[in-house]
UniProtKB/Swiss-Prot annotation:
Residues 239-422 form the Helicase ATP-binding domain. Residues 56-122 have a biased composition (Low complexity). It catalyses: ATP + H2O = ADP + phosphate + H(+). PANTHER family: RNA HELICASE. May have DNA helicase activity and RNA helicase activity. Probably have ssDNA and RNA dependent ATPase activity. Residues 518-738 form the Helicase C-terminal domain. SMART domains: DEXDc, DUF4217, HELICc. Residues 124-144, 519-537, 872-889, 896-908 have a biased composition (Basic and acidic residues). This is ATP-dependent DNA helicase DDX31. One of its GO terms (cellular component) is nucleolus. It comes from Dictyostelium discoideum.
Length: 908
């Protein structure tokens, strides 16, 4: 039985059992191989067995070469059985069931034979894959990357974990390990704001208002009512030359008081003579935006408070034209206007006298040219110059701007005659160099007390980073000596966030104001304390809003007693109702463990401002944000020029500006008149070279890590540490916040449509950067899938492009019928696309419409609507009805056309 068992051959799992036989020579070994191969025809087909035979043949060839070259090869065989061989010229093979470990030390002559034998061997799948990868690496080294996305970024970070943008988990883990923690194991957030104190001598002059040859009543108004104790440097330098009557070009940095520098001398000159309303307009102030014109008008009203006989006025687009015409007919002495509406009244309003105009002031002149008002401004100046002959005096023209350019030089050559340059470098003026060329070479000036930061963020993390930063800077997340601050940081916090398009402003404002989040529970606070505190905060906000609307904390004293009694009873009833509601909420919270209070995203009010809003809402939001103690303003570049918004702490540039000069104007909304301020610029990894571009203009920007911003997600809006199961993982906090906004878009169709419009407008605005920055902000650098993620969209870019065509058509077809409107919608456009989508299961509600077939019961013939059969009778009837003369004329025309085409061809 043992011999029969030894003769068994097993082909299962590529194993074979062979009889044990002693081999004493090479010839016996070869014969032994041949016998086993002939007996095992089925097994020879297996790849593993062929590889074993090839190895054995290679060993035999190597041994023959060793005998010819007299090379002594030692073999060390560790056999578990009693059979051992003392031959040093060949190796025992692996056909024995014992474990043999062969160590061959071959000479250099055997390398050629072994290489030849390896060529005959077929490589495995893994070997092929390794070879392909090596070839690809060699090709990449020889030939550089074709696309800019795969280029290596210059100035890589020293830390390899943070430089790898794809490895988010390692980045978050590294940030968690690196952050400092207090005694209670809470992450300590860095204090970014630096307490830079600017001396008054750097902003304000040492002179008094009386030394500038101003009237006493005007000085008392400036000091007492307007609370301006001393003039600024630009006001000191500009008031005296403007009072002399010279044309002036005023250049100064933002927030230095340029408005009063030309208003004060105009008012001083008008107070010297007795001015009446019937005299008409003496001064025209042209501004680029409506908000700036309303701000100047408000400042002018304060300045003219003691001089009641001087009448100010304002005209701008969006207002009632007939009401403006009536005000002009009554008489306006100082007029603030936008260029389009002013040109309209000059051309069409006959009751607009321009004979007495002594001053024409262009505020933010460079912005007037950038917005395309150059043609309107030139026509206005030409209309005013046409009446020079009838005027008894010379008109004084003043240009005011924070930056100078070639367009302003053209405008200055048109309007100014031998002007005085105020605010430029005195060395340049002494040399006689052109001030406009010197201004282009001049570096951009930012206030010293302004801290500038930038953060490098991936596209998919932009939305969560923005929300985390706003929550950080508008809430009470401050730690002092291991305790949470009581909450004075958000009481006076204001922030302006700049976007590149109006659609983006509308989308973010709608999402931030309408979305409700679960109330984040702190570590120490209970549900009862939470509900009570939330209710108290709401009551406090309602009281403040009532006071803000009415302007008085108490009612009028001359009210009836009955009314007061009724009001007291109503107040008591409302208080009892509120107490009952609080008790109900407490009962629900104690009974239901899953009870959660819904709150808004931010704890401060949110405002929006852009050019597509109507004029009433624009003025209302502007003054509401200006007068409110805290808030967030989402806006475009409309708010970047000239607006004086007090107590703004942070400027966030979510979308970088298209022009480098607009960067200075944006950050100039904070750190005004010596106050402290900060700015933050969001950049993609491909846009990091923009920092080097700003350094050419002497603008130094510090870096802020994304992880420092995202650390604020560990805290609630009240400044407490979140009590959640995932609070120790930063990645989970970011992921949950992103999912929250994506789910909001799924259930809100209006928000989804607004997000799609914002996505398309962002791409269009990204392609409008100027030539000097085009190489940095190029649209081909964007990852469109990640950009859609930043708008909380889950659709792919191809789907969004299909939908955008439907949205544009629906906007265009406003007066069409229902069928055309339905065809232009996004759902109709995506109907066929979704049914052929590679990710669909083929079971959609509206599959592709196949060809409709009509069945004729009489003949039983199937007619396809796309394959119409020819009917001779129809052709005959058509020929009968047609006129033979017309047919001949058509044939003759076709024949003439053919002849003419042949002639042209021959001539060519």
């Amino acid at each position: 039985m043992a011999d029969e068992d030894d003769g068994l051959q097993l082909n299962i799992c590529y194993l074979q059992r062979v009889p044990k036989k002693e081999i004493n020579s090479k010839a016996e070994e070869e014969a032994y191989f041949k016998e086993n191969i002939s007996n095992n025809n089925n097994f020879t087909n297996n790849r593993a067995y062929r590889e074993k035979t090839n190895k054995n043949e290679n060993n035999l060839n190597n041994n023959k070469n060793n005998n010819n070259n007299n090379n002594n090869n030692k073999t060390y065989n560790n056999n578990n059985s009693n059979n051992s061989y003392n031959n040093n010229n060949y190796n025992n093979n692996s056909f024995n069931n014992n474990n043999n470990n062969n160590y061959n030390n071959n000479n250099s002559n055997n390398n050629n034979n072994s290489n030849n034998n390896n060529l005959n061997k077929k490589p495995t799948f893994l070997e092929k894959k390794i070879q392909q990868e090596q070839k690809q690496k060699e090709l990449k080294e020889l030939k550089g990357p074709q696309h800019h996305r795969y280029r290596n970024q210059e100035n890589e970070e020293s830390n390899a974990i943070e430089s790898n943008s794809n490895n988010f988990k390692d980045k978050y883990k590294f940030a968690e390990n690196k952050t400092k923690k207090d005694e209670f194991n809470r992450p300590i957030l860095e204090t970014i704001e630096s307490n830079i104190k600017v001396e008054k001598s750097e902003t304000f002059s040492s002179m008094n208002w009386g030394s500038l040859q101003l009237s006493e009543t005007l000085v008392r108004n400036l000091v007492g009512h307007m609370k301006h104790e001393k003039p600024t440097h630009i006001q000191e330098a500009s008031i005296t030359p403007i009072l002399k009557g010279n044309d002036a070009l005023v250049k100064a940095q933002t927030g230095s008081g340029k408005t009063l520098s030309y208003l004060i001398p105009v008012v001083q000159k008008l107070t010297e003579q007795r001015v009446t309303r019937s005299d008409g307009c003496y001064c025209v102030i042209i501004t680029p935006t409506r908000e700036l014109s309303s701000q100047i008008y408000e400042e002018l009203q304060k300045l003219l408070k003691p001089f009641y006989w001087i009448v100010p006025g304002i005209i701008m687009g969006g207002e009632n034209r007939s009401a403006e015409k009536a005000r002009i007919r009554k008489g306006i002495n100082i007029l603030v206007a936008t260029p389009g509406r002013l040109l309209d009244h000059l051309q069409n309003t006959q009751s607009f006298p321009t004979d007495n105009i002594k001053w024409c002031i262009l505020d933010e002149a460079d912005k007037l040219l950038d917005l395309g008002f150059e043609k309107d401004v030139t026509t206005i100046i030409n209309l005013l110059d046409s009446k020079k002959r009838t005027m008894k005096f010379k008109r004084q023209n003043i240009l005011v701007s924070a930056t100078l350019s070639e367009g302003i030089s053209r405008l200055a050559s048109l309007s100014l005659t031998s002007p005085v340059y105020i605010g430029l470098d005195s060395k340049v003026l002494e040399k006689g160099e052109n001030p406009f060329q010197a201004a282009e070479k001049e570096m951009l000036q930012a206030p010293k007390q302004l801290d500038q930061f930038y953060v490098e963020v991936e596209s998919k993390e932009r939305l969560t980073s923005l929300i985390a930063f706003i929550r950080w800077k508008t809430s009470n997340i401050t730690i002092d000596k291991g305790d949470v601050a009581s909450g004075n940081s958000s009481a006076n916090s204001k922030m302006i966030v700049f976007f590149s398009s109006c659609d983006s402003v509308d989308f973010h404002h709608y999402m931030f104001s309408n979305m409700k989040m679960d109330k984040e529970r702190g570590v120490k606070r209970t549900k009862k304390e939470q509900i009570k505190q939330d209710k108290l905060i709401q009551q406090h906000k309602q009281k403040n809003s009532k006071i803000f609307q009415t302007g008085n904390e108490s009612d009028d004293e001359e009210s009836d007693n009955d009314d007061s009694d009724d009001s007291d009873s109503n107040n008591s009833d409302s208080e009892t109702d509120e107490e009952k509601e609080i008790e109900k909420q407490i009962k629900e919270a104690t009974s239901n463990p899953n009870y959660r209070v819904k709150t808004s995203v931010f704890s401060v009010p949110i405002f929006k401002l852009h050019g597509e809003l109507d004029q009433q809402t624009r003025t209302k939001t502007f003054f509401d944000f200006k007068n409110s103690p805290n808030g967030i303003l989402l806006t475009t570049d409309v708010s970047a020029r000239g607006l004086d918004l007090p107590s703004v702490n942070w400027i966030v540039q979510y979308d970088p500006c298209s022009d480098t000069k607009d960067y200075i104007h944006r950050i100039g909304r904070t750190a005004r008149l010596g106050n402290q301020g900060c700015s933050l610029l969001f950049l993609l990894p491909s846009e990091k070279k923009y920092i080097d571009h700003l350094a050419k203009f002497n603008v130094s920007v510090k870096e802020m890590k994304v992880t420092t911003i995202l650390q604020s997600l560990f805290y609630t809006s009240d400044g407490q540490l979140k009590k959640t199961s995932k609070s120790s993982q930063l990645e989970s906090q970011v992921h949950d916040l992103q999912l929250l906004f994506e789910r909001f878009l799924i259930y809100d169709s209006k928000a989804k449509e607004m997000a799609r419009c914002a996505y398309q407008s962002f791409l269009r605005s990204y392609a409008t950067h100027k030539a000097d920055v085009k190489s940095i902000f190029h649209i081909s650098y964007l990852h469109l899938g990640h950009v859609s993620k930043s708008f909380a969209l889950r659709e792919t870019p191809t789907e969004l492009n299909k939908m955008s065509a439907g949205i544009k058509g629906a906007k265009a077809a406003k007066k069409g019928d229902e069928d055309t409107l339905q065809k232009q919608t996004a759902d109709f456009k995506m109907k066929n696309y979704k049914s052929v989508n590679e990710f669909s299961d083929g079971l959609n509600d509206q599959p592709l419409q196949r060809a409709n077939f009509h069945y004729e019961s009489a003949s039983g013939v199937i007619h396809n609507i796309y394959q119409r059969h020819f009917n001779r009778n129809e052709r005959d009837e058509a020929d009968k009805n047609s006129n033979p003369k017309e047919i001949k004329e058509k044939k003759r025309r076709l024949y003439d056309k053919k002849i003419e085409s042949n002639k042209k061809f021959k001539s060519k």
